[in-house]
Design a protein with these regions (language model features):
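Detector for outer-membrane/organellar transmembrane beta-barrel domains
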Residues: 274-411, 415
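Short cysteine/histidine-rich metal-coordination sites, predominantly Zn2+-binding motifs
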Residues: 56-70
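Transmembrane beta-barrel outer-membrane domains
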Residues: 73-75, 105-109, 147-151, 211-215, ...
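Outer membrane beta-barrel
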Residues: 55-57, 78-88, 103-242, 258-274, ...
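Boundary of Sec targeting at the N-terminus
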Residues: 31-33
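N-terminal secretory signal peptides that target proteins for export/translocation
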Residues: 1-12
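The canonical Cys-X-X-Cys-His
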Residues: 42-51
Length: 429
């Protein structure tokens, strides 16, 4: 088993080395992985609803759950994605607009990613993403920006399938670096994304802990999918280190976990004709050190509990999808660790999204989110030291009411003239 694991990690490290080298030279833009399409012989719309990454079709979910192993292994399983953006903010009032609204009304090259993915053996497959962020850091003195390359979502799987006249059982293991990245529906935190701009204001960044650990942790999980109906997963996460440091390569540890932290997932899925629907629950317990640089002493205890559902209608030329998720987080011990004034707080986050795509080319979506929670002057400060012995309002991200309450709408229109190119326009309010 150790030899097999070493072989898989060796494959992945080779993939990542190639990805880092090629990230500077591979052009193009992709909504789905062309390497997966080459391996399976299928087009992007076979795996992605309306061709829109990352929303998976039933076939796409099957491909992922069976370890990315369907089809024949290709010689060079690499793909590339490039994202450019232009952002115009209506109200740029700020004490430091060059920082808070940098590059406003400027067309720019935002990020580039290289993906290494596909079949390694009959039962082992990999999805690995390396991303270059062209505007990763800003020098506080010169205000100049610099780029940075880092590990993104990584999922290494072992999977098998038992088929019979009345039985279809898929089971496997996933080694990954983001809670819920192993999931196959687009309602969990790792995949319930719209297309954000790097410089647009999208409200305070407060989110449940399950959504804050990506690319900082290592998780090992076991999962099963019975008769394409019942999905169950249980995983354990720790801060990535030692032999698993490649899972966080290039990323700063902002949230350091104490020991092992469980994540569980249960979902029921049903498919009839062009329709499919899912209803699920998920949860995570996490013990977090207050200072990631000094992992010792008391911890803050986070308990996330979520419910989600998804609907899809897939019948050419129409694709309709709808998603809903709600996460309630309880936070305890923050007064001891210094991250909050209260001994106990709560955080609630709801997300809704609906989309329509015609002929996998023209489409639109409407998203809504709402975050609420306990008032706490330490966790959600509204004032800061002005450097002259007084206090001033924290611009942009501060909360005058000392709470995380935020809500917003994101309508979007998009066009895919060819399979691997997507152009979109969105409005955030």
């Amino acid at each position: 088993m150790n030899k097999l694991f070493s072989q898989v990690v060796g494959y992945l490290k080779l993939f990542l080395r190639c990805a880092f080298l090629l990230s500077a030279v591979l052009p193009g833009s992709a909504d789905a992985l062309p390497s997966f399409a080459r391996q399976t012989g299928q087009s992007c719309v076979a795996c992605h609803a309306g061709g829109q990454f990352p929303e998976l079709t039933p076939y796409g979910r099957l491909f992922k759950l069976t370890g990315y192993t369907i089809g024949q292994r290709t010689a060079l399983p690499l793909s590339a994605m490039v994202i450019g953006s232009y952002t115009k903010t209506r109200n740029t009032e700020s004490s430091a607009p060059s920082v808070d609204f940098a590059k406003d009304a400027v067309a720019l090259f935002q990020t580039a990613s290289v993906f290494a993915g596909g079949r390694v053996t009959d039962n082992i497959g990999v999805f690995a993403q390396v991303t270059y962020d062209n505007y990763s850091q800003q020098n506080p003195d010169t205000l100049a920006w610099s780029g940075h390359t880092h590990a993104d979502n990584i999922d290494i799987r072992y999977a098998d399938r038992l088929l019979g006249p009345a039985r279809d059982l898929i089971f496997g293991l996933s080694l990954n670096n983001n809670p819920s990245v192993a999931d196959v529906w687009n309602t969990v935190p790792a995949w319930s994304q719209y297309v954000p701009t790097v410089f647009g204001f999208t409200g305070p960044s407060t989110a449940p802990i399950v959504a804050q650990l990506g690319q900082q942790v290592v998780g090992l999980g076991a999962y099963t999918f019975w008769n394409q109906t019942v999905y169950a997963e249980i995983s354990s996460y720790q801060t990535a280190k030692g032999a698993f440091s490649f899972l966080k390569a290039g990323n700063q540890i902002d949230t350091r976990l104490k020991g092992s932290n469980p994540y569980v997932r249960l979902a029921i899925s049903h498919e009839w004709g062009p329709h499919n629907v899912m209803l699920g629950v998920f949860g995570m317990n996490a013990n977090v050190y207050p200072d990631p640089a000094f992992p010792s002493g008391p911890v803050t205890r986070y308990r996330d509990r979520g419910i989600d559902t998804q609907y899809q209608y897939l019948l050419d030329p129409h694709t309709v999808t709808a998603q809903f998720s709600y996460v309630r987080e309880s936070i305890h011990g923050g007064d001891v660790t210094g991250v909050s004034a209260s001994a106990a707080n709560t955080l609630n986050q709801m997300k809704l999204k609906g989309s329509y795509v015609y002929r996998a080319k023209l489409g639109g979506s409407l998203s809504y989110f709402k975050t609420t929670g306990s008032s706490d002057s330490t966790a959600y400060p509204g004032l800061q030291d002005d450097g002259a012995g007084g206090m001033t309002v924290i611009p942009i991200s501060g909360s005058a009411a000392n709470n995380p309450d935020t809500q917003g709408w994101i309508p979007e229109l998009f066009w895919s003239p060819v399979q691997n190119v997507r152009a979109g326009i969105q409005y955030f309010k």
